[in-house]
Regions:
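Internal glycine-rich alpha/beta core junctions
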Residues: 1-75
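Glycine-rich cofactor/substrate-binding loops
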Residues: 48-230
């Protein structure tokens, strides 16, 4: 039983993290997703507010499942290696955990199926470059393509970010001459390295962010969950 609770606790870690992503993505600050009316509620004070109740409840249920596992482990730690009546405590923990996990999966499924994802807003958030998220791509490009030691490439890109930030510019808005003042090995290829689509495509390792790898992961997930013919 304790092994089942352990496995289900790990599953709830993943479900809770997914729920947290949905909560963040549906917030006004992110604006990456809109959850359906079926899994949200309004506010008694603020008429415009949509509370992601379903996802929040799943996140909370994770703590409940972890508590069941911790409780049973605490019971087991003091038992001799034989059957004891204390072990009756595992039934309530097991049944409650299984029911909680199954319900959490249904709720998250409803959240995802009913959600509207705003890809344009996601791209806008990336391309705003407020955090210079493409700086690492530039460092990797200087090291891999132009042969700079990564330590030097890292320092050069840090200086370029400071330059761009001080002027309220994006890295890709810098002139080639400005790149070369800090990193003489830089050429016009740095602009390709800084493009969002190019950066995603380069991450082509298994489970990477390249579109081809994302499609593979989706196809694999669908295949795993297809009803098995007997």
């Amino acid at each position: 039983v304790v092994e089942i609770l352990s496995a289900l606790s790990i599953r709830m870690v993943h479900l809770s993290r997914l729920a947290e992503e949905l909560i963040l993505w549906s917030s006004q600050e992110f604006g990456f997703a809109t959850l359906s009316d079926a899994v949200t509620t309004g506010s008694s004070i603020m008429p415009q507010k949509r509370n992601p109740d379903g996802a929040e409840l799943v996140r909370g249920k994770a703590g409940r499942v972890f508590g069941r596992l911790t409780g049973l482990l605490s019971t087991l730690k003091a038992l001799p290696l034989a059957y004891n009546k204390d072990l009756q405590e595992d039934k309530e923990a097991l049944f409650d955990t299984v029911e909680t996990v199954l319900l959490s999966q249904k709720v998250l499924t409803a959240n995802i199926l009913g959600a509207e994802f705003h890809s344009r807003r996601m791209r806008e958030a990336i391309e705003a470059r407020q955090g210079y998220a493409n700086a690492t791509e530039l460092a990797d490009d200087l090291a891999a393509r132009r042969g700079m030691p990564f330590r030097e490439a890292h320092a050069a890109v840090k200086a370029l970010v400071e330059l761009a930030r001080s002027q309220g510019r994006k890295l890709e808005d810098l002139r080639l001459e400005e790149f070369q003042e800090v990193a003489p090995a830089a050429d016009h290829g740095v602009y390709e390295a800084l493009r969002t689509d190019a950066a995603l495509a380069r991450r082509s390792a298994v489970m990477g962010t390249a579109p081809s790898r994302v499609r593979e992961a989706l196809e694999d997930a669908r295949a795993r969950w297809q009803p098995r013919k007997t």
